Each structure stands twice: as C-alpha cells, then as structure tokens.
Amino acid sequence: MAYVLTETSAGYALLKASDKKIYKSSSLIQDLDSSDKVLKEFKIAAFSKFNSAANALEEANSIIEGKVSSQLEKLLEEIKKDKKSTLIVSETKLANAINKLGLNFNVVSDAVTLDIYRAIKEYLPELLPGMSDNDLSKMSLGLAHSIGRHKLKFSADKVDVMIIQAIALLDDLDKELNTYAMRCKEWYGWHFPELAKIVTDSVAYARIILTMGIRSKASETDLSEILPEEIEERVKTAAEVSMGTEITQTDLDNINALAEQIVEFAAYREQLSNYLSARMKAIAPNLTQLVGELVGARLIAHSGSLISLAKSPASTIQILGAEKALFRALKTKHDTPKYGLLYHASLVGQATGKNKGKIARVLAAKAAVSLRYDALAEDRDDSGDIGLESRAKVENRLSQLEGRDLRTTPKVVREAKKVEMTEARAYNADADTAKAASDSESDSDDEEEEKKEKKEKKEKKRKRDDDEDSKDSKKAKKEKKDKKEKKEKKEKKEKKEKKEKKSKKEKKEKK
C-alpha cells in the first residue's frame, strides 16, 4: 500500500492511495486535475489532531528541522503492520529521519511527490471530514504568525537590528558632517579665511557663522558661549585685519542655511551616539566593557547579528573586517592580517607596533567569551562584570609585553564567599629553617637562570658571527665566479678577433 503523510495546521493526516505505484506515474498531473479524481485516489487512513496552538508550533518546527516528534512516530506505527508499504513525504530531511526509526516500509521523497502534494493541498478541505476551508485558513494564519514570532524571538531589549541600523547611520552622518563642514569652510573662507586656522572644530565654526554673520560685526558680537576667552580675542583681532572679500546678504543667507544643517546634524549625531551606547549596554554589556560601544557595534553589524558573532571563533573575530587583505594575502602567499575592526579598540591602540598583533589575538579570545555570555547566558545581568574582568586581564598582558604599567580598569569586586572559622595553629619553629632552606634554593635557581641567559646570549652571538662569515664567503665566491666568467668572455673575444684578422689576411693574399 502507498500512504501520503500530509502536515496541516490542524494535525497530521495519513492518506491512503488506491494506486500502490502512484509516485511512479508518468501522467500524474492529468490523473489528479479535479476534486473527484483526488477524492477517488486518496482516502483518509488516520488523523492525529494538534491539542493546542503551542503543540502545533512545536510539531511544525520539528518538521522544518527534519525531526520526527513522538506524536508523528505514534501515528506512523499504525501503518507499521502493513508489510511492503510505501510512505510518501514532502521533505527529504524528514524522509531520512523516518528511515532511521527502522520501520518496515519504504520512504519516498522526490520531485514527483511534489505534484501529489500540490493536488492534495488544493482539495484538502474535501479530503478531511469536518474541516471547512475557512477553518483551515484561520488555523494556517495563526500557525504562520506563531512560527514567525518563534523565529524572530522578539524582545525589545534584545533587538540587535537597532544596533546595526544605528551604527550604519552614525557612519553616514560622520561622512555627511565632514563634507558639509569642508564645504562651509571653503565657502565662508572667501569672506573670513583666517577663522578656519583659529577655530578647527566644525560645529563651533558653524555656530560662529550663525552668531556673527559678516566679519565686520565680530567686535560687537559675544562669542563667550561658543569659544574660550583667548580664542575669542584672536577671532575678533583677525576679523579687523582680514584679507577676505566682501559678500552679499544673499550669499550669507545660503551660508547660514548650510551652517544650520551642520549644527542640527551634530546635535542628532550626539543623540544617536547616546542611543547606541544605551542599546549596546542593554544587548552586549560585556562586549561593550571590553572593546567599547563603537567597535562592538561594528563587529555585530559586520557579522549580521549578535548570535552569529557569538558563534564565531576568536580567530574569525580577530580578522573580522579585513577579509580583502586576508584573501589577497592567501592568494599572493604573504603574511595574513593580524587584526581587522579590533584595530580601533583602545587596548590595541595602546600597544606598540610589534605588540599590536599579540594584543589583538588576546582581545579576540576574550571578546569571544564575552559575546557567548552576552548572547547565550540564561541568567546574565547587565553589569558587564565578565567584560571588566577580561579587560583587566588584557591590560595585564599588555603591561607585561610593554614593560610598563598601563592598567586603567579597576578590579571587579565580587561578593566574598563565606569563610568558616577553625582553630588557630600553634607556632612552628621548624618552619624557619625550612624557609631559610627554600630561600637558599631560590637563590641557587636565580644563579642558574642567569648562567642560562648568558649562555644563550653567547650562542646567539656566535650564530650571528657564523651567519656573517657565511655571507662574506658567499660574496667572495660570487665575485670569484664573476671574474672567471669575464676572463673567459675576454679570451673568446680575442680568439674571435684573431680568427677574423687571419681570414682577412688570407683573402688579401689570394687576390
């Protein structure tokens, strides 16, 4: 017998086909082109109803993942009695999972079976007694919404999409602000060129334009809210002796409009930066404590989500953002990059050139731990203690490599464990002699280490001298070889010239 397993929003339906070899039919589409033919071909053999919406969601997820649930297994055992029967299923993964159960029937899932399912889905309400088309549609819609919610796992505090969009917008704002500020300085620079050299901050420059207007009003304009007293005096002095040209009121209006845009963009950028910082502390507090808000947000945006970044190994996190350099290095067989986006982290920035790669590797390892705690820990809090501890360890490692104290992060004070009081021990006089012996042993160990270091230095020096000698000997051999080749060339040339002279002489004598 041939059975067709149909998954509906109401439950599992097991349909019995009248034709044993229906899945081998060449004219299947013509055989199942009407409801009468479908009803004639298939009869319902068993139906396992879902008890609730939660049960329906659980079963649907099992089918999507290619797993056989206990409810489905119970239904399949009903056709176990029919020997040499065939079960037609829609998914290949599900077919493989059913085969592993060891039931006594053949499981089929191929391109031909899709036509069977297409016909069954079209006339499904007629095949299931007591089920109307409207009821099935409502159930399907409810189940679709449940699956969607399950996949999204929506939580207002866990939406990393907000971080991805915020960091992308922040980068765009920075580019726009730089472009607008440059254009504003070039435009207003025709009227007051000295101002750009005195005031380097773009926002302060735009605010001065809005407050002062034309440079002739500088002396009577109060700029104390924008600039310090010394710089304000310099601006006013420069305005009196400026080399700039005069501009019309129309020009100034357009410059003011651009300056207003710069001030508004800067205010919105600051607001967006604060929003991003708050989001990062809510979603990835440990990563934020370790690498900072901006670097952490860029890592999440580059990988697509917090979960996918947490699944990445430390080696991937280390070079994330340097993919082009990595593939170019692999193609040309050169050294691979040591860091990507992590280069902009403050801890990597504190290291000198030779230690940047080592610190990037340590930082990537600690970032991987922090990310997994942020993304996957069930009982995590938003204090970021793991990130602070990891940062302290990276700073200690950096201090060891640099040979100077660079530690800035305070130690995380955790709640002390309860200590049980025991009876105090009496003074042991023998311990003094043991201590003295251990001190003498440590002194002897130090002497042995010093001897080893001296020996290693001597060996390194000898190797260096040997290398230099070998280089000199190679150079001498090369020079000797070159001289020999030159000599041989010269001899050949002389022989050739003699031969030519001789032949010329013989020709003359013949004449």
Curated annotation (Swiss-Prot):
Entry's localization field: Nucleus, Nucleolus
Any single Gene Ontology cellular-component annotation: small-subunit processome
GO biological process, one term: rRNA processing
Domain of life (superkingdom): Eukaryota
InterPro entries: Nop56/Nop58, NOP58/56_N, Nop_C, Nop_dom, Nop_dom_sf, NOSIC
Residue ranges constituting the Nop domain according to the UniProt record: 283-403
Record field: compositional bias (Acidic residues): 440-450
Signal sequence region: none
Basic residues biased stretches: 454-463, 474-511
Region (Disordered): 423-511
Coiled coil feature spans: 435-511
Keyword Coiled coil: yes
Binding partners and assembly: Interacts with SIK1/NOP56 and NOP1. Interacts with the trimethylguanosine synthase TGS1. Component of the ribosomal small subunit (SSU) processome composed of at least 40 protein subunits and snoRNA U3.
Function comment: Required for pre-18S rRNA processing. May bind microtubules.
Family listed: Belongs to the NOP5/NOP56 family.
Protein name: Nucleolar protein 58
Organism taxonomic ancestry: Eukaryota, Fungi, Dikarya, Ascomycota, Saccharomycotina
